Amino acid sequence: MRREIAIILILIAIAIACCGCIRKPQEGGIATTKIKIGVMPDEATLPYYVAAQEGIFTNHGLNVEIIPFQSAMERDSALIAGEIDGGGNDPVSVALMRNAGYDLKIVSLGLQATPDKMRFAILASPASNISSVADLNGKKIAISRNTIIDYITDTLVGDTAVELKKVEVKKMPLRLQMLLNNEIDAATLPEPLASYALYKGAKLVISDSMLNRTISQTVIVFRADFLNNNSEAVNEFLAAYGEAVKRINANPEKYRALLVEKTHIPPEIASNYTIATYLQPQVYPETDFDTVIHWLQAKNLLHRTISYEDTVWRGE
């Protein structure tokens, strides 16, 4: 009898101890949720780092781990493998992954070009005589095929008679090096590499900020399985992101050092580099989605229907 009582007491003690292991709610009653976010070393990631370092994620009941990647391929592989839950991405990549059968959702628009701040540019080599889009006709341009870079290149050239000789150079540092060494006529580069190339003598042919419409946008994505099970946490994530955006836009210089550190902006241009104006979380526009899908269809890169309704999450 005593032994039975002792066993019961032990079981009660274990049960009480386990109760202490249950996730405790933060202030406001929000349970702590772990989210793994994958990021690239580009300026679109700054709000994530600000929200993490200034405790904004924590205040929203989130435990966010930011995982850096050096290539989009590595980031996307981690996303579809379930090693990360979401993060920054681009609409071309998202559409191609959905086409391959991976259920990802765009939960918000991210960063985009503005009239005073480019995100992508076509640049000519320092020794070239290229000064306009028309001058690109028949010239070799370094890109990465079937990516946002390829999409931006085609869109910047537009409906002209210009025929480009596209050269596959996936690694952006190599693309930059070939451009500056005059080994290629032109290249399409993202920021901050585009600004650095200009600093080193490359010539600006055209950038996305020179157009009268927005063509280059980042998006925030999550795996559908994570989103379905953690919709409240994703809403809190976007709210925290929005708070970080407010702080950055209110005092961008305060975050210059963090931006330089996380995006590897070359020291030669770090002090004068234009900091982007960040957007509040918002639904990714259907018109922009359709433009990307039409481009992918024209290149025969889609073998299934990729609909706006299935791809874009409107919140709950």
Locations of regions flagged by a protein language model:
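Hinge/cleft segment of the Venus flytrap/periplasmic-binding protein
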Residues: 304-316
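Pocket-lining segment of extracytoplasmic ligand-binding domains
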Residues: 92, 166-258
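Soluble non-cytosolic domains of exported or imported proteins
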Residues: 42, 70-73, 88, 143, ...
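Generic structural marker for isolated residues within well-ordered, non-membrane alpha-helices
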Residues: 12, 53, 153, 256, ...
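Secretory targeting signatures
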Residues: 1-28
